[in-house]
């Protein structure tokens, strides 16, 4: 074994794929299979939201992610498509700095705004159906010769000598695993409902912590959100929170009223002041840290994976 990757969310899987497809022998060790990781609760439209660090570094990683996800949208079975959508607000709204990478960003027309909203931005971007995408990533990793072991890691020190290269993609679990006191979980709860025919995603940018209203259509279903609850480690869905989520989404998209509720998901976004992507000596080998992507893990994962692969292979 050349590389041991810890974690099988989107960040761990893309890192493992980038190394395995380069010809290295890679094993993933994970506390839960991909479909049970935080990644499954992601929306997930491209955009490194709530990711900390220098903007130029985030833009570089995000650009790679945008390119890879856009290419995957042309392939069947990946769970990725190019979707149109809007970010709206009741107050003047500046676009995120990373939207400069989107070629068709434009102000919303008045007819495109929900009732009571005064401004917003319209664009197209990759939209990811996470259960399908995670299955695709796992299959791609295994086709490249990778192995996945469901076995929790209690301490990084137990892995010294396990492989010449160990990559820590443990997400919020890095708080205790490293340990990293700068690691803060940001709890996100979402509701899965039957889609009444909505085609465009919609995000309400009005701040109302810990609430954030968004909806992401995925064919016959639609993902409704959500929460940004900092410091909350609870991974069980709350019926009261779910009720508030649905009400918020109905408030900006009345077609959702009465939609059948199909399920609930909870994930812990791994936030820290700066994404941690760096290497350190580890026994006779090297330990890479690749975690702390906040709400931008799907968007940044391919760029971070490429940076690790370049270094390991050089």
Predicted features and spans:
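Dinucleotide-binding Rossmann-like beta1-alpha1 core, especially the glycine-rich loop
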Residues: 44-118
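A short coil-to-beta-strand element that immediately follows conserved catalytic motifs
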Residues: 80-84, 148-149, 254-266
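C-terminal catalytic lobe of FAD-dependent flavoproteins
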Residues: 136, 259-314
